[in-house]
Structures are given as structure tokens and as C-alpha cells.
Amino acid sequence: MYYPLLSIALGSVLGAWLRWFLGLKLNPIYPQIPLGTVTVNLVGGFIIGFAMAYFAHSDLSPNYKLFVITGFCGALTTFSTFSIEIVTLLQSGKWGMAMLAISIHLIGSLIFTCLGLAAYYWVAGH
């Protein structure tokens, strides 16, 4: 009964720690479009794409899916952080940079989700 809750909680802790670490290390490199936020959204898109395909063909306990998708990816990806970064750019009058950041996050995440799906099918030989 508690395994789903524990699965989500443990995945969330690990995802949040990784998000914090990548933000700490990568955001100072190019603050106009914080690379930590971009990285976690792209990596999260890849992981969720791969995981969805994997779990669709797996007999593993649903708790593993909760751990990876709901917990880890849910804590790793950063829509709220992305939103405030875009609003800050807009408030600073940096409309072009805001549109570039939106494009990178949205298109990049979709591409990386597709790459994750494709990677699973390539690895699994489907």
C-alpha cells in the first residue's frame, strides 16, 4: 500500500537533487537562458520518452513507473522555474531572448522526448 508513495517520494528526492545541482553548476554559464533549466527539461523529456516506451513493454511493478515518471521526472523538470525565467526576461524588455528561450525549451523538449522513445525502440530492437 505504501510502495507507490515511497516510489514517488524517492524519485522526487533524486530528481530534485539533480535539478538543484545542474542549476547550480550550469545556470551561471549563460544566465540569459539558464542552461541548468534547459538541460533538465531536455534530459527530462528524453527520460520520460524512453521510460514511457519501456514501461509499455515491461512487466515491472507499476511502482517503477511511478518512481521514474511521476517522481524523478516530475521533480527534475522545471515548468515553474522556466515560467519565472521567461516572465523575468519579458519584464526586462528582452522579448527576443524570451522567445528564443521558449523555443529552445518547447521544441527541444519535444525533440528529446521523441529521441527517448526512439532510443528505447533502438535498444529494445523494436
Curated annotation (Swiss-Prot):
<keyword id="KW-0472">Membrane</keyword>
<dbReference type="GO" id="GO:0062054">
    <property type="term" value="F:fluoride channel activity"/>
</dbReference>
<dbReference type="Pfam" id="PF02537">
    <property type="entry name" value="CRCB"/>
</dbReference>
<keyword id="KW-0812">Transmembrane</keyword>
<feature type="binding site">
    <location>
        <position position="77"/>
    </location>
    <ligand>
        <name>Na(+)</name>
    </ligand>
</feature>
<dbReference type="GO" id="GO:0046872">
    <property type="term" value="F:metal ion binding"/>
</dbReference>
<keyword id="KW-0915">Sodium</keyword>
<keyword id="KW-0813">Transport</keyword>
<dbReference type="GO" id="GO:0005886">
    <property type="term" value="C:plasma membrane"/>
</dbReference>
<keyword id="KW-0407">Ion channel</keyword>
<dbReference type="GO" id="GO:0140114">
    <property type="term" value="P:cellular detoxification of fluoride"/>
</dbReference>
<feature type="transmembrane region" description="Helical">
    <location>
        <begin position="33"/>
        <end position="53"/>
    </location>
</feature>
<feature type="transmembrane region" description="Helical">
    <location>
        <begin position="4"/>
        <end position="24"/>
    </location>
</feature>
<protein>
    <recommendedName>
        <fullName>Fluoride-specific ion channel FluC</fullName>
    </recommendedName>
</protein>
<keyword id="KW-0479">Metal-binding</keyword>
<comment type="similarity">
    <text>Belongs to the fluoride channel Fluc/FEX (TC 1.A.43) family.</text>
</comment>
<comment type="function">
    <text>Fluoride-specific ion channel. Important for reducing fluoride concentration in the cell, thus reducing its toxicity.</text>
</comment>
<dbReference type="InterPro" id="IPR003691">
    <property type="entry name" value="FluC"/>
</dbReference>
<feature type="transmembrane region" description="Helical">
    <location>
        <begin position="67"/>
        <end position="87"/>
    </location>
</feature>
<keyword id="KW-1003">Cell membrane</keyword>
<feature type="binding site">
    <location>
        <position position="74"/>
    </location>
    <ligand>
        <name>Na(+)</name>
    </ligand>
</feature>
<keyword id="KW-1133">Transmembrane helix</keyword>
<keyword id="KW-0406">Ion transport</keyword>
<feature type="transmembrane region" description="Helical">
    <location>
        <begin position="97"/>
        <end position="117"/>
    </location>
</feature>
<keyword id="KW-0997">Cell inner membrane</keyword>
